[in-house]
Amino acid sequence: MGKGSEGRSAAREMTAEANGDKRKTILIEGVLYDATNFKHPGGSIINFLTEGEAGVDATQAYREFHQRSGKADKYLKSLPKLDASKVESRFSAKEQARRDAMTRDYAAFREELVAEGYFDPSIPHMIYRVVEIVALFALSFWLMSKASPTSLVLGVVMNGIAQGRCGWVMHEMGHGSFTGVIWLDDRMCEFFYGVGCGMSGHYWKNQHSKHHAAPNRLEHDVDLNTLPLVAFNERVVRKVKPGSLLALWLRVQAYLFAPVSCLLIGLGWTLYLHPRYMLRTKRHMEFVWIFARYIGWFSLMGALGYSPGTSVGMYLCSFGLGCIYIFLQFAVSHTHLPVTNPEDQLHWLEYAADHTVNISTKSWLVTWWMSNLNFQIEHHLFPTAPQFRFKEISPRVEALFKRHNLPYYDLPYTSAVSTTFANLYSVGHSVGADTKKQD
């Protein structure tokens, strides 16, 4: 582990195939593999690390994404090996030495954490997370069963929070850091996201892995592909026509993001993107969980005496609140930070340091509210580590960053939220700015 060096890339070679396609190579722990004909079980994310012709060093990404997999190394060993002497650095000797030092330090630190048990799941923590969600849903429906308008409103709000908490625990399961058993975490992810949020856990995992592979990297991080509903960076709106309906929408996106855009994004996911993916990939069990969600909701609302129309309205309100809860918390960790060019290759540590921020890590309330993902830097460094352990390792991560002159941001929650909305406003008003400068 850690034998590879971030930044090294494979020399470009032509395949022996008659069609003349470029060979796709990938470098892991100093070994160069031919991945041209390899169908990655985890989807197209592997293309980020082969980049068509020149494979980049994927050691850190490979180990973090496959830490709990018993099959990954078997797949890797089955790939044809190429002459590693053709591997050359795209950086100067000084820059490559800096990156190699980070790689060695990071690998040694990670091995320490594994040996000390920081990657081990906790059964009491698992029980707490599940019981909390069940209790929140039960309380929400109990409140909605009361005749008081105040109880009804509180019940809808509580239900939205419960759906958001389902999103948090699904996120943990999707990373394989809940039970630590990949197949079990995957099935639980599908159940909690399907019943709790009405969405596909498998689709989410497919997309979210791309975000982790290259956060805030244009044409790689799917979290930047948010048009037409919202835009988080000026570079993604350069092709928006000034004066168009989209341009007008973006000018007010800072005001619409929470009350309108979050709901529209959620509805787009649950009614179109996720079902389309589930149909294409034949994720039949996920349809079962989502149908169970709808049947359960409307049956229960009917039993409580609510009309179909009122039941739909209450569903949309609670669903929308859940979307606001989740989407806003994810937005504050990345969206206001700089982006990198498609061709840029950052070190694994640099992605976490420069394109991620921690938020109020000393606050127990924020830690609960964000379900330990206010330690976003640690999460991006170690995506398969149980998230409740990040608080314990954060001082050591900060020390690691200090040794390599990397920033370690920890913003107050209120500052992170205000910065996020200020960025939405700035990006929305940047449409056409390049044209005006040219004039």
From Swiss-Prot:
Keywords per UniProt: Electron transport, Fatty acid biosynthesis, Fatty acid metabolism, Heme, Iron, Lipid biosynthesis, Lipid metabolism, Membrane, Metal-binding, Oxidoreductase, Transmembrane, Transmembrane helix, Transport
Cofactor names: Fe(2+)
InterPro entries given in the database record: Cyt_B5-like_heme/steroid-bd, Cyt_B5-like_heme/steroid_sf, FA_desaturase_dom, Fatty_acid_desaturase
Reactions that this protein is recorded to catalyse: an (8Z,11Z,14Z)-icosatrienoyl-containing glycerolipid + 2 Fe(II)-[cytochrome b5] + O2 + 2 H(+) = (5Z,8Z,11Z,14Z)-eicosatetraenoyl-containing glycerolipid + 2 Fe(III)-[cytochrome b5] + 2 H2O; an (8Z,11Z,14Z,17Z)-eicosatetraenoyl-containing glycerolipid + 2 Fe(II)-[cytochrome b5] + O2 + 2 H(+) = a (5Z,8Z,11Z,14Z,17Z)-eicosapentaenoyl-containing glycerolipid + 2 Fe(III)-[cytochrome b5] + 2 H2O
Membrane topology of the entry: Multi-pass membrane protein
MF (Gene Ontology): acyl-lipid (8-3)-desaturase activity; metal ion binding; oxidoreductase activity, acting on paired donors, with oxidation of a pair of donors resulting in the reduction of molecular oxygen to two molecules of water
TM region(s), chain numbering: 123-143, 254-274, 287-307, 312-332
Chain ranges for the short sequence motif Histidine box-1 as given in the UniProt record: 171-175
Enzyme Commission number(s): 1.14.19.30
One Gene Ontology biological process: unsaturated fatty acid biosynthetic process
Keyword Lipid biosynthesis: yes
Superkingdom as given in the UniProt entry: Eukaryota
Domain Cytochrome b5 heme-binding: 7-88
Subcellular location: Membrane
Span of the annotated motif Histidine box-2: 208-213
Top-tier EC class: oxidoreductase
Residues reported to bind heme: H40, H66
GO cellular component, one term: membrane
Motif Histidine box-3 location, chain numbering: 376-380
Function: Fatty acid desaturase that introduces a cis double bond at the 5-position in 20-carbon polyunsaturated fatty acids incorporated in a glycerolipid that contain a Delta(8) double bond.
Family: Belongs to the fatty acid desaturase type 1 family.
Domain text: The cytochrome b5 heme-binding domain acts as the direct electron donor to the active site of the desaturase, and does not require an external cytochrome.
The protein, known as: Acyl-lipid (8-3)-desaturase
